[in-house]
Amino acid sequence: NIYPVKGYSITVGLNDEASQAAAPQVSLLDDETKLVTSRLGKDRFRVAGTAEFNGIDLDIRADRIKPLVNWVNECFPGVDTRRVEPWAGLRPMMPTMLPRVGAGKKANVFYNTGHGHLGWTLSAITAHQLAGHVLQNMGQTVRSFSTPTPAAAAA
């Protein structure tokens, strides 16, 4: 079975020069709190973390957002957190935390799901592997990501 796991994030509006200067320019991972950050251009900063097993529920709980805001205030005191946009979304996850990648029980049905919080990280490579499996069954091959297309090789 695949289960919905709710993840939370906040996007902090960096509305002034002091906040823009105080927010990190690179992505960070706080191993202790398991929070990750991404700078989104000049005027936005995202902090994401936490996981909640709560069925198909997209309600945004204040008690899940507050620690994210507090973390920004503690780690980056120069960032103004008065303008914060909370978000919650469901990520498909398997109980084993391993994605389901491969053929389904019915003909021509294939799965590439259940990556959980590593969806953006792993889904491209597992899609590539799955494409290879599908094409191999059709008697074809799939080019690797680094193989230039014929048009690119001719240029």
Region locations from a protein language model:
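Active-site substrate-recognition segment that forms the wall
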Residues: 1-107
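C-terminal lid/capping helical subdomain adjacent to the catalytic/cofactor pocket in oxidative enzymes
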Residues: 14, 98-155
